[in-house]
Regions:
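A low-complexity, Ser/Thr/Gly/Pro-enriched, surface-exposed linker/loop concept
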Residues: 20-44, 70, 75-163, 195, ...
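N-terminal export and membrane-targeting signals
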Residues: 1-5
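An exposure/low-complexity boundary signal
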Residues: 152-186
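Extracellular glycan-recognition/adhesion modules and their associated mucin-like linkers
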Residues: 46-60, 108-109, 168-174
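Residue-level signal for mature regions of secreted extracellular proteins and peptides
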Residues: 6, 56, 91, 108, ...
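Bacterial signal peptide processing site
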Residues: 14-17
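Extracellular/lumenal glycan-associated surfaces
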Residues: 57-70, 173-193, 218-225
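C-terminal motif of bacterial Sec signal peptides marking the signal peptidase cleavage site
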Residues: 9-12
């Protein structure tokens, strides 16, 4: 022991120990994270046609900063009707869209009726941001593409598996909307309007801006199998 101590002194080395009383700072609130986190180089995440797409390092959330015509999203990794001629009359709106491999159940207030009589279920696992609104859930039958790829029975293959990883703490921005990978999930928002969402496998939060009611963060509860 003495010999080891003498070697440390002679070489000028220092030994650090963890402070048992240290408490790491709490994560920033979603909108603060989006405002303050550094922006990543958008070129790395461009999939053409003015779309930025990424997946988180743990492969739990995949998102795109893209455009929508009505309910039709321009997603390069999924079949869609965004470019159909019949939709050209619809206005183009910038959006952020995220899918989860496993996800929290919907809060009752976020369930949107009977899906206009289509007999589809209104299910969680996706979040959509427009410049003035954020929502969680959608009308669909079956699993999300992320659930099919990276859920409990996922194939771990396909277009989503090829998306570039947005490192934890980084931000992406397109047409006034931002997304950031942080706190074991992803936050997306329109910082100037105070509208956004946070999604993770354990919980979600919708932030509707100062003129609307924001949902409190969801406690960790029921998830999809």
């Amino acid at each position: 022991m003495l010999a080891a101590l003498l070697i440390i002194i002679a070489t000028g080395c220092t030994v650090t120990t963890k402070d048992p009383a240290y408490v790491p700072p709490a994560p920033l609130q979603p909108m603060e994270q989006l405002e303050k986190a550094p922006l990543a180089d958008a070129k790395t995440f461009s999939s053409g046609d003015d779309v930025l797409s990424f997946i988180t390092a743990d492969r739990t959330v995949a998102c795109s900063l893209t455009s929508a015509r009505g309910e039709h999203l321009n997603l390069p990794y999924e079949q869609n009707r965004y470019s159909d001629a019949s939709n050209n009359k619809l206005p183009i709106v910038p959006v952020a869209y995220c899918e989860l491999a496993t996800y929290p159940a919907l809060q009752p207030d976020d369930t949107k009726g009977d899906c206009a009589g289509t007999h589809l279920g209104y299910l969680g696992g996706v979040a959509l941001l427009t410049p003035d609104n954020a929502r969680y859930g959608e009308c669909r039958s079956g699993v999300t593409p992320m659930e099919a790829a990276f859920g409990p029975k996922g194939s771990k293959t396909g277009p989503l598996a090829q998306l570039p990883v947005l490192a934890d703490g980084q931000n992406l921005e397109r047409n006034g909307l931002r997304c950031s990978a942080y706190n074991d999930g992803v936050a997306c928002g329109n910082v100037s309007a105070g509208v956004g969402f946070f999604v993770s496998p354990k919980r979600y939060e919708l932030i509707q801006g100062p003129a609307k009611t924001s949902h409190p963060p969801q406690s960790e509860g029921q998830k999809t199998p």
